[in-house]
């Protein structure tokens, strides 16, 4: 599966699908964390919902009308517990597992990455480093307090790979 937060959907309007998959053979299970069930049904995620399932995780006390709106558009909505820190990520992962999603690629932003790192939910990191300056509108890939992350738990899985001017570094969590 591919996991993003609602902020990424609003900012980028992604499809989260395999671009060159044969018709009817899109294997990606798309997952969005949307605490308030406010995703617009006219976003790109709903364009090919019949071919690529969309799972939306929301607070268990989200508005029933909003949940029904998303379900009527074809999404699978999963209310989960939450606290001040956001949705219960362990419950999100449990529901994903129950739905047959055994591996998840997080393409979300810094908030989601921070939560997953803080809770020790990441086994492998793919860091793609590009020589591009983002400027003032750029979004950080890591939490503001990256020092709080236990980086020593990760080690290189293979030699860095170079793609043009970009470099890919793959890190595995030790012991996993």
What are these regions (language model features)?
Residues 1-176:
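Enzymes that bind and transform nitrogen-containing heteroaromatic metabolites
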């Amino acid at each position: 599966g591919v996991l993003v937060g609602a902020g990424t959907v609003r900012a980028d309007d992604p499809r989260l699908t395999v671009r060159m998959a044969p018709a009817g053979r899109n294997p990606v299970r798309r997952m969005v964390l949307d605490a308030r069930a406010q995703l617009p049904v006219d976003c790109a995620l709903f364009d090919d919902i019949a071919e690529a399932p969309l799972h939306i995780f929301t607070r268990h006390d989200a508005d029933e009308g909003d949940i029904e709106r998303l379900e009527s558009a074809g999404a699978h909505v999963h209310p989960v517990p939450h606290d001040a820190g956001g949705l219960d990520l362990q419950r999100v992962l449990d529901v994903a597992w129950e739905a047959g999603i055994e591996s998840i690629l997080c393409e979300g932003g810094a908030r989601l990455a921070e939560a997953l790192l803080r809770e020790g939910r990441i086994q492998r990191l793919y860091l793609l480093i590009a020589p591009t300056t983002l400027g003032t509108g750029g979004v950080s890939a890591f939490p503001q307090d990256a020092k709080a992350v236990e980086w020593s738990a990760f080690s290189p899985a293979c030699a860095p790979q170079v793609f043009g001017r970009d470099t890919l570094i793959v890190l595995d969590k030790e012991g996993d």
